[in-house]
Amino acid sequence: MRLENKVAIITGGASGMGRGAAEIFAREGCSVILAGRRKSVGESVASHIRENGGSATFIQADVSISKQVENLIDETINCYGKINILFNNAGINNHVRGNPDEEDEEEFDKVISVNLKGAFLCTKFVVPKMIEIGGGSIINNSSVLDAAATHTSSTSYHLSKGGMAMLTKKTCIAYAKYNIRVNTIQPGAIATEMSKINWDDLENRDIISSRKDIQPLHLMGHPYDVGYAALYFASDESKFVTGSSLLVDGGMSASIA
């Protein structure tokens, strides 16, 4: 097992790419902590993982609130004694065409708070715990849009994801001496609730191929596609990889004009 005896916090772990990573990590021997705001959904997913032989706990937390992030870290340490892996996956997108002169300030603040501030806070409070145990892996789930602007995405979303990419680089150089590796995943169009596709619909090929014109592979990615990328960064297979970005986008970035 590639993550045997490891402990991972996955923010936004109750749905989409976070759930995909949680299920894969658990199958590889990792104890996973699903962090999120929706208690009933999170506890249901954690129960599903346990029923399939994995170790999973849901902890309710809003990653944009410092005190709740501190509590998330403290509860994880109390339950498992350590944190080896952090997957900063929680994210929102208001799905509006928001140029700087158009986007609502309240919506802007909300997206930045969850996507970027949330990743910053989790990193801030996890790093000391990783230093104590001699290292760890931090994975930031950004976007193919962290380095390319489009007319169809909001200013806040682009800035939040671009900021996550730079958070990876800053954290990488700051903590490499402590054997903490930090990497970014850049997903393209993945079939998640953010894309209005529920987990139960993932086996429906008509739905998955509904956005076939978006990317060269002519289908949307599955949450497991991002989960396996996260598994690589979480495992010792990437022990010499830090400060890196991995595109999981079906070729989308190659065709963005």
Q: Language-model segments: which ranges?
A:
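Alpha-helical segment proximal to the catalytic Tyr-Lys
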Residues: 128, 173-177, 239
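Catalytic loop of short-chain dehydrogenase/reductase
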Residues: 92, 139-163, 168-177, 189-190
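Conserved glycine-rich cofactor-binding loop
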Residues: 14-16, 38
